[in-house]
Amino acid sequence: MSASEKVWEELAKNTLRGAMMSKGVSYAVLAERLAAIGVEDNELNLRNKVSRGRFTAVFLMQCLHVLGAEWIHLPKDLEDATGKHGAQSLAKKAPPTSI
């Protein structure tokens, strides 16, 4: 895997984590909400999948849907959304009705 791919995985992970933070949703609640739309996964599996940042666009859209996200904030500078505090940065910059 190239360094560039790792940056994109970090962005995907932090986008989802930022959405969860801004909506106040835990992995346990995310698992319940996903189950309600037919996506069966447990809390531990979700935590591992998200922490790796390796998931499909379909999974990301399913998660954002059950979180009630209306749009996705993608920063122009990827460094704003990657790294140790990238998810917090995304959660703070999003308007209240978005992620």
Set out the residue ranges of the language-model regions.
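Short alpha-helical "recognition helix" segments of helix-turn-helix
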Residues: L30-L34
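Short, charged recognition helix plus adjacent turn
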Residues: E5-K6, L74-I99
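A short, Lys/Arg-rich alpha-helix, primarily the initiator
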Residues: M1-S26
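DNA major-groove recognition helix of helix-turn-helix/homeodomain DNA-binding modules
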Residues: T56-H73
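Recognition helix of helix-turn-helix/homeodomain-like DNA-binding domains
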Residues: A36-R54
